[in-house]
Amino acid sequence: MNWKKIMAVGLAAVSMMAFVSGCGSDTKKADTQLPKKIVIGLDDSFPPMGFKDDKGEIVGLDIDLAKEAAKRAGMDVEFKAIDWSSKEAELKSKKIDVLWNGLTVSPEREKNILFSDTYMKDKQYIVVRNDDNAIKGKSDLASKVVGVQQASTGESALQNDPSGKTVKEVKSYADFVSAFMDLGIGRVDAVIADGVIARYLMTKEPGKYKIVEGTDYGVDNFAVGFRKDDTALRDKINSILAEMKKDGTADKIVEKWLGSSADLDKSDAK
């Protein structure tokens, strides 16, 4: 073997070592990009996803999912109540690191938020008092007062649907609990709400409210929200959520709060 061949073999070996070393460095770099603690922003009046219990502690379906995910990622987690209508500003200003609270994916939100894979699916429904037989469909909202949560998917759904053009008034609330209270006493005629929260609140006051069947405003995909450049954190949470769906942990958490895991999206559980 002449010296040119020796040099070629040597350079190839060095290049291979550099490649392997580089891969190791990239992996290590990706790991170090993950924070030791994450602050999760949420609306703490959004049962059963996240809310304060009788002791003033923040609990809920998303809280349990987030705690388990953070545990598996080796991170500490803090839950911070925020003004939900300012959620994107809170995330961008780094007052919080993550949005995890029944957050629906939408093209408008995708402009400012990096979303995880979908972990649950839901729909927006018309909810009325149980004794109200006048509202049987979207067209019956004409000349009615309708309640929505401010900056919610339900608010957007009503605004973008023809039925929203015929209502008498749209009343925006800081949270769904307040909207349902006003529905109960007749201040509004209907509320546009997520099926998950509607069914949960209906179980707390049996016989008081009902969902108007066949009035959904399309399917909502629940996902976790991150800053646009937090791809490493997003990818880690995606991986962990897929594991939780595969090993049954996610099913148990959803069943605990909803009685069934039918709304859980397992398309990424491999």
Locations of regions flagged by a protein language model:
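Short helix-initiation/N-cap motifs at beta->coil->alpha
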Residues: 63, 79-91, 133, 170-185
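A ligand-binding cleft/hinge motif common to bilobed small-molecule-binding domains
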Residues: 103-111, 159-160, 182-185, 189-218
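Extended ligand-binding regions for polar small-molecule ligands
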Residues: 24, 63-72, 132, 139, ...
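Periplasmic-binding protein-like
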Residues: 44, 121-128, 199, 203-238, ...
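Extracytoplasmic small-molecule ligand-binding "clamshell" domains
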Residues: 30-102, 236, 247
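Acidic, polar ligand-binding/catalytic clefts
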Residues: 67, 76-140
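Ligand-binding clefts/hinges and TM-proximal coupling segments of bilobed small-molecule sensing domains
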Residues: 25-30, 153-171, 210-213, 242-270
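Ligand-binding cleft/hinge of the Venus flytrap
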Residues: 52, 66-75, 154-173, 202-206
